[in-house]
Amino acid sequence: MIKKIILVLSLFGLCSLAFAEGKVFNKDYSGIKEIQATITTDEGEIVIDLNFKEAPNTVANFVDLAEKGFYNGLTFHRVINGFMIQGGDPDGNGTGGPGYTIDDEPNKLLHEYGVISMANRGPNTAGSQFFITQMAQHHLDGKHTVFGRVTKGNDVVCRVEQFDRIINIKILEKK
């Protein structure tokens, strides 16, 4: 009998996970012209214009985590030269996140050279992990939410090595 109860409870838990919706941030962007993130790494600074018009919830999630200091001290745990650098995993091995997921935000932004996009394990599974492209990666279009573009520090993106640290991420909202 106890085994049946455990089985039923386990199935209920799995079903509730399957139908869970991603976390939604209700950030008001009225009056804001642009949002920039400066990622300070062991190799230098990367400045990114965040596109809150095309990916409002994704940007709000990234900004919220950055302002809480979530990314401070984490590493770029995955670096594939000529492809991308990936960070934002508190476990440092590609499996960690903030304890919740956000839904994808399909948009017209493409995986061109120097864009920031959310890493995921499939549809609607993004959390805190992001990657920055070192070259155009159009095979990723429609599979990951692009939410910004590097405006300064592409040379830093190309110098980052696996396990280099994200010292901090500072957010600047221009009105």
Residue ranges of model-derived segments:
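Cyclophilin-like peptidyl-prolyl cis-trans isomerases
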Residues: 2, 13-175
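Sec-dependent signal peptide recognition
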Residues: 3-8
